[in-house]
C-alpha cells in the first residue's frame, strides 16, 4: 500500500457537487501556517484528455447546467488539515473552509498562476530562449529538466514542462519571456491575483521556491484555480499525464515529462474519479501543497 502524503494545505475547485465528500488521503493532511499571519495541439499529448464536469447530458443529448446543491445541511467533514477550501467553480461560492484565510507558502502550485498569465499573454508557438539567469537562479535541489543557456522550447512545450514536471527554470524563462524579469512578472501575478479577488496573496517569483514574501491562502488559491481551469489552454495542460518535449543539449533525444498529480492516474491507488486537473507543490518550508 502506498503511503499517503502529508499536505500543507488544500485548495479544491468543483464544477458540480452532489455530495460533499473528502478523499481518503485528506484525513491525514497536516499543515504548518506561516510565522506571520488559441487552442493547444494534442499531437504530443498521451493517454488522457480533459474531463468535462460542468454539466450532464439529458436523453436528447443536450447539455444541461450543473445542478446547484444546497450544502448547508451537510455535516462538515473532519480533516486533519489545518487549511483547506472547497470552492464551487460555477459561482465561486465556498462549500467548505478550514482556515481558508490563513496565509501559507504555496510552493509549486504557484505555477498555476504562472501558466494562466502565460496562456493569456503568449502565442503557444512562440520560441522561449533560456537565459543564464533563468537556468541558474534556483535554490539547491530545485526540480529542473536540465535546460542550459541558449536552449529553446516553444511556449506550449514550456507549459507542459511547467505543470507536469514542475520545472523551475522553465518558470523563470516564461517570466522573462512575458515580462522581462522575475520581478516584473511577479508584479503581473499580483495584479492578476487582485483582479480575481485575492486579498491575502503576494507572489515574489514564478515558481514558488522559498521566499518569505511569497504566500497565499487556501481561499485565494481556489480563486486562482477557478480562473486557471476556466482557461482552455491551462485546463488541457493541467489534465495531461504525459508529454514529450523536443531535443535540448542535455536531452538530445527529447524528454518525456509525467504529471506528478497522482489523483489523475487511474493506475494509482490515489486516483480520484472526476478530477479534471491540478498541481502539486513542495518546498522545505511549505511542505506539500495541492490545488485541484
Language model features by range: what are they?
Residues 19, 122-123, 289:
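Ubiquitous "structural anchor" signal
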Residues 27-219, 228-232:
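Active-site-adjacent loops and short helices of periplasmic peptidoglycan-processing enzymes
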Amino acid at each position: 500500500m502506498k503511503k499517503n502524503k502529508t499536505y500543507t494545505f488544500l485548495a479544491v475547485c468543483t464544477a458540480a457537487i452532489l455530495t460533499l465528500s473528502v478523499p481518503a488521503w485528506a484525513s491525514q493532511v497536516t499543515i504548518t501556517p506561516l510565522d506571520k499571519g488559441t487552442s493547444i495541439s494534442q499531437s504530443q499529448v498521451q493517454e488522457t484528455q480533459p474531463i468535462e464536469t460542468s454539466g450532464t447530458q439529458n436523453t436528447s443529448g443536450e447539455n444541461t447546467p450543473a445542478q446547484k446543491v444546497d450544502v448547508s445541511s451537510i455535516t462538515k467533514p473532519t480533516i486533519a488539515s489545518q487549511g483547506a477550501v472547497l470552492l464551487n467553480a460555477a459561482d465561486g461560492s465556498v462549500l467548505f473552509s478550514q482556515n481558508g484565510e490563513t496565509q501559507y507558502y504555496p510552493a509549486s502550485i504557484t505555477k498555476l498562476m504562472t501558466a494562466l498569465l502565460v496562456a493569456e499573454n503568449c502565442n503557444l508557438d512562440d520560441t522561449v530562449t533560456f537565459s543564464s539567469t533563468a537556468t541558474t537562479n534556483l535554490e539547491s535541489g530545485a526540480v529542473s529538466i536540465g535546460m542550459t543557456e541558449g536552449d529553446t522550447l516553444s511556449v506550449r512545450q514550456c507549459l507542459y514542462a511547467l505543470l507536469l514536471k514542475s520545472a523551475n527554470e522553465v518558470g523563470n524563462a516564461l517570466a522573462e519571456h512575458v515580462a522581462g524579469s522575475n520581478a516584473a512578472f511577479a508584479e503581473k501575478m499580483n495584479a492578476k491575483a487582485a483582479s480575481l479577488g485575492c486579498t491575502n496573496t503576494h507572489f515574489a517569483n514564478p515558481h514558488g521556491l522559498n521566499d518569505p514574501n511569497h504566500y497565499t491562502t487556501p481561499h485565494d488559491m481556489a480563486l486562482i484555480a477557478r480562473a486557471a481551469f476556466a482557461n482552455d489552454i491551462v485546463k488541457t495542460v493541467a489534465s495531461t499525464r504525459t508529454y514529450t518535449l523536443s531535443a535540448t543539449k542535455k536531452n538530445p533525444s527529447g524528454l518525456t515529462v509525467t504529471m506528478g498529480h497522482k489523483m489523475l492516474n487511474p493506475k494509482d491507488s490515489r486516483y480520484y474519479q472526476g478530477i479534471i486537473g491540478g498541481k502539486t507543490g513542495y518546498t522545505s518550508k511549505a511542505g506539500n501543497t495541492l490545488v485541484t
